[in-house]
Amino acid sequence: MQRRQQQKEAPSNQNIMATILGSIPREAGVTKIEYEGPRIALYTNTPRYLLEHNEIISNLVNVIKKRIIVRIDESVRKKEEDARKMLSKLVPAEAKLQGTFFDTTTGEVSLEAKRPWLLQRNSAEFSHADVSEKIGWTLRIRKATTSQSSTMQVINRTLRASSIERGKQLKQIGDDIFRPKLATRSEISLTALGGFGQVGRSCMLLSTLDSKVLVDCGVNPGAAHPSESYPRLDWAGITLDDLDAVVIGHAHLDHTGFLPVLAKYGYRGPIYCTEPTLPMMNLIQLDAIKVATAQGRVPVYAERDVRQIMRQAITLPYGTVTDISPDIKLVLANAGHILGSALCHFHIGSGDHNFVYSGDIKFGKSILFEAASWNFPRVETLLIESTYGAKEDIQPTRQEVESAFINAVNGALADGGKVLIPIPAVGRAQEIMMVIDHYMKSGEMAEAPVFTEGMISEASAIHEAHPEYLARELKQKILETDDNPFDSEYFTNVEHADGRDEALRDGSPCIILATSGMLEGGPVLEYFKSIAPHKQNKILFVSYQVNGTLGRRVLDGARQVPLMNRGGKIEVVNIECRMEKLDGFSGHSDYNQLTGFVQKLRPKLRRVLVNHGERRKSENLALAVRRMFRIPAHYPQIQESIKLF
């Protein structure tokens, strides 16, 4: 008997509505049932009943195998201004409510509070059912950040302005997802369009007889020619209208940098990602426009294309099964790489095949994130990255690298020097901030002012707004106590060039975190000019320095470098300070962690594919998997198509 026949079948899409109507009691006050993208929305004019009898929805989900959400009917919603006034009285003062956002498309109101734990407990003092019944809006409790994220504010404004358009779009997406299957058999293939045999422009097409899903859509910023810079969508043999969905694993440009171009040329379908990935990728994509313009290049997309992505994005939490096409379900799981990074688990057909795309993963816990998830019920095919896939790619343990970091910083501060840390704004900067805060509080690192500049503050605000995606201990600190490391007394954000004077004042030891991580532009260069000529100072590199970058030249021993001053003239900077490079803070798994991840999945796997690495490293990891685990392993090349089932 085939696997699909063995599984308990859910009702057909035509019978779903009838099943729901037959299962909901009259007391629930359901006024209408609509598709809302990949979900089915039940609208009610008596929200308390379903909120207090949530087993009704749970039982329905088990029967129909679809996501169901409860929405409050528009007829009982209070006007926003009235609801806001009521909330100001209903929310306990000690929760420190900072702001509200009303999403008219979904009927949800987000409450941003300094002490969200006082609102999440659903206590007698603050009952969600009571409040929702009074104001006619469903509640979402959010952590209010120390400084507001301008990126998230722009997203909220964009969502409000496009509310009617989004509502229509979500209904159309639902119609497309829940359309009848046409194929009576399964054929599944994966086509490599970028990021195979290389790092950069990650992109692939997952195809069945019923569906076409694009997974990641990145760029290769270092490539000299467009044919090497962008995904080879011309090889996919499809139009943008053929796509059922785009799925994004994480926010970095090598995975999302070409996504605005899809919007520019007419893609209007759903874009699935985790909630923090949306603001993170918008931040990075908009910054890429600024960088291209500053370098005299014409950006391949405009700000309006990034805003269009905001309208099309459907954000998903970890661990939630979501229909994204008639025959593909998606589950996102923690990848441990950067904020919101996700492994993508595709359940295809009626149990025919399960495909997991690792994206960029860190299979090791850090102070910022939990280790990548691995406990999938079924995985027949795994596609795994190989950034550090060579046998010699072994990183020190976190304990070792944090100890080395403490010693490097303490030594420079003890000599009366300044420590400049060139750093990427997303991920690495927040991890170093958490390490500094932790060890200064414990007394293992000398206390000194810590200055940050660049996009670090904005990226940190996005981290702070999504504590549920952080390591367990850090999440608990932010959500359940007043001890918020992102609001540490040690940190000062430099918002304007005039603010650098305090950090650069003579005889004042300090730590400076500034972008960019490779000394290729950004405010770090202004600090570099002042810090490099003095022997007591130190430049501490904690991220990879690519060949040809200023960071690599400095690390390799350059003693003089020409830089442009504010007047537009070239000045020579003498380098007398000390240099140090620390490995181990990487957001990628090393060789041992990659093979360890495969080991965890070994009993379920039938095939391993390898991507996202230099060809030599991808080949080495594939050979290691075959040798160590006796599992077929292959490292595809761009334009190759692999039959999965």
Swiss-Prot record:
Region (KHa): 10-77
Recorded superkingdom: Archaea
Cofactors: Zn(2+)
Binding site for Zn(2+) 1: 250, 252, 337, 360
InterPro entries, A to Z: aCPSF1, Beta_Casp, KH_dom-like_a/b, MBL, Metallo-B-lactamas, RibonucZ/Hydroxyglut_hydro, RMMBL, TffA_KH
EC annotation from Swiss-Prot or TrEMBL: 3.1.-.-
Cofactor note: Binds 2 Zn(2+) ions, which are required for nuclease activity.
Region (Metallo-beta-lactamase C-terminus): 587-645
Region: KHb, residue numbers: 78-146
Any one GO molecular function term: RNA endonuclease activity
UniProt keyword annotations, A-Z: DNA-binding, Endonuclease, Exonuclease, Hydrolase, Metal-binding, Nuclease, RNA-binding, Transcription, Transcription regulation, Transcription termination, Zinc
Region Beta-Casp, residue ranges: 392-586
Hydrolase as UniProt keyword: yes
Protein's UniProt keywords contain DNA-binding: yes
Any GO BP: DNA-templated transcription termination
Region listing for Metallo-beta-lactamase N-terminus, in residue ranges: 187-391
One Pfam family of this chain: Lactamase_B
SUPFAM superfamilies named in the record: Metallo-hydrolase/oxidoreductase
Residues involved in Zn(2+) 2 binding: 254-255, 360, 612
NCBIfam families: arCOG00543
Function: Terminates transcription on the whole genome. Termination is linked to FttA-mediated RNA cleavage and does not require NTP hydrolysis. Cleaves endonucleolytically at the RNA exit channel of RNA polymerase (RNAP); the 5'-3' exonuclease activity of this protein degrades the nascent RNA released from RNAP.
Family (UniProt): Belongs to the metallo-beta-lactamase superfamily. RNA-metabolizing metallo-beta-lactamase-like family. FttA subfamily.
Assembly, per entry: Homodimer. Interacts with RNA polymerase (RNAP), interacts with the Spt4-Spt5 complex.
The protein, known as: Transcription termination factor FttA
Species for this entry: Cenarchaeum symbiosum (strain A)
Gene expressing this chain: fttA
